[in-house]
């Protein structure tokens, strides 16, 4: 049985591998999305993105969307603009439904950072969203796969 920890202490890594790629849940200062939770997605040294969560409203899924959809950060290659040279298009910033699962792959939506960390997080559209993001400074730096597995560091 894997060690457990609180959501705020857990690090999630891609199930398919991915080197230094990590996902960490954080508290949001601006709860305008209706949730006090978000996450930081680190894809490479000096390349990190903040996402906010929009909670589910009954039948709908919870959703993760880029919290700061302006220009993407500088990549290790030093590029700011998209490879095509186009300006970022409104509304195409990365987003995905987000699903949380326990050890038996039952839904396990956390209430806050002190809640037990779910074993797995599923972001089914995130990799594709990065591929089609017009402001992506480096399409080679994108999340791999959609399943993220908890690491409590024990």
Identify the role of each PLM range.
Residues 3-7, 13, 92, 124-125, ...:
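Alpha-helical protein-protein interaction elements
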Residues 4, 17-19, 59-61, 70, ...:
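Exposed regions on extracellular, virion, or secretory-pathway luminal proteins
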Residues 2-79:
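N-terminal secretory signal peptides
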Residues 75-104:
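N-terminal leader/propeptide segments of preproteins
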Residues 100-154:
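Glycine-rich, aromatic-bearing surface loops/beta-hairpins
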């Amino acid at each position: 049985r894997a060690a457990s920890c609180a959501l705020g202490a857990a690090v999630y890594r891609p199930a398919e591998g991915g080197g230094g790629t990590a996902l960490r849940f954080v508290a949001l200062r601006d709860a305008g999305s209706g949730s006090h939770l978000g996450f930081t997605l680190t894809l490479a040294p000096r390349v990190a993105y903040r996402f906010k969560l929009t909670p589910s409203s009954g039948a709908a899924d919870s959703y993760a969307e880029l919290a700061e959809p302006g220009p993407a950060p500088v990549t290790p290659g030093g590029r700011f603009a998209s490879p095509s040279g186009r300006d970022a298009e409104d509304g195409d910033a990365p987003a995905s439904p987000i699903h949380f699962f326990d050890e038996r792959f039952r839904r396990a939506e956390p209430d806050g950072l002190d809640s037990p960390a779910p074993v797995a997080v599923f972001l089914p559209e995130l990799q594709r969203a990065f591929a089609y993001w017009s402001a992506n400074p480096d399409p080679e730096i994108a999340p791999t796969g959609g399943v993220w597995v908890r690491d409590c560091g024990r």
